[in-house]
């Protein structure tokens, strides 16, 4: 990669965005930023608390401001929250300011990776698998809409996915 363009990772919860993002940033010598972590740091509270207090709408407004700010940086690998693509504004800034990588995963793998994670407010339901299926139905077309590259992450290590991303980005330029 001659120039260090921004790389934005999108996809559902449990796709590996944060893990792969850290690996990718390390391999490229770039800064890694997790938008959810920045939201929590700025709010002084975790996401489930923000959801409880402000609802999903309040959280999404925070997320929109943070993503707009973070995408103005140069040479970063940014991992976004699974629902960030619900905002047209987020989709626009992600598309305009970097290379968008959609990390795709099956609902089965998502469920396996997230079932013990209590920090996922949208999964604190009677039937989390059904919730994941409903989210996928709405969000997957939005991920596909803005993705420059799509990669399946189900049975691959973070290092292997990061290596594939680097190869594919090199081919884009």
UniProtKB/Swiss-Prot annotation:
Residue positions binding Mg(2+): 18
**Where, subcellularly, is it found?**
Cytoplasm
- Tell me the GO molecular function terms: ATP binding; magnesium ion binding; shikimate kinase activity
Question: Which intervals of the chain form a coiled coil?
Answer: none
Q: Which Pfam families match?
A: SKI (PF01202)
Q: What class of enzyme is it?
A: transferase
**Catalyzed reactions:** shikimate + ATP = 3-phosphoshikimate + ADP + H(+)
* Binding-site list for ATP: 14-19, 120, 156
> Main localization of the protein?
cytoplasm
Cofactor(s) this protein requires: Mg(2+)
Cofactor binding comment, as recorded: Binds 1 Mg(2+) ion per subunit.
Please describe the quaternary structure of this protein.
Answer: Monomer.
HAMAP family in UniProt: Shikimate_kinase
What name appears for this protein in its UniProt entry?
Shikimate kinase
Q: Which organism is it from?
A: Actinobacillus pleuropneumoniae serotype 5b (strain L20)
């Amino acid at each position: 990669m001659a120039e260090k363009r921004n790389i934005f990772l999108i996809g559902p919860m449990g796709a590996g965005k944060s893990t792969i993002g850290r690996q990718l940033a390390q391999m490229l010598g770039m800064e890694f930023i997790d938008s959810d972590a920045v939201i929590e740091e700025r709010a002084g509270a975790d996401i489930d608390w923000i959801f409880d207090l402000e609802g999903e709408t309040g959280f999404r407004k925070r997320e929109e401001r943070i993503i707009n700010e973070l995408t103005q940086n140069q040479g970063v690998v940014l991992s976004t929250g699974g629902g960030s693509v619900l905002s047209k504004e987020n989709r626009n800034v992600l598309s305009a300011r970097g290379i968008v990588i959609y990390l795709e995963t099956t609902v089965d793998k998502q469920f396996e990776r997230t079932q013990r994670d209590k920090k996922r407010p949208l999964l604190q339901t009677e039937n989390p698998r059904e919730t994941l299926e409903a989210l996928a139905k709405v969000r997957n077309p939005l991920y596909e809409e803005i993705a420059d590259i799509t990669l399946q992450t189900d049975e691959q290590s973070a290092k292997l996915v990061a290596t594939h991303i680097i190869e594919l980005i090199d081919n884009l330029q």
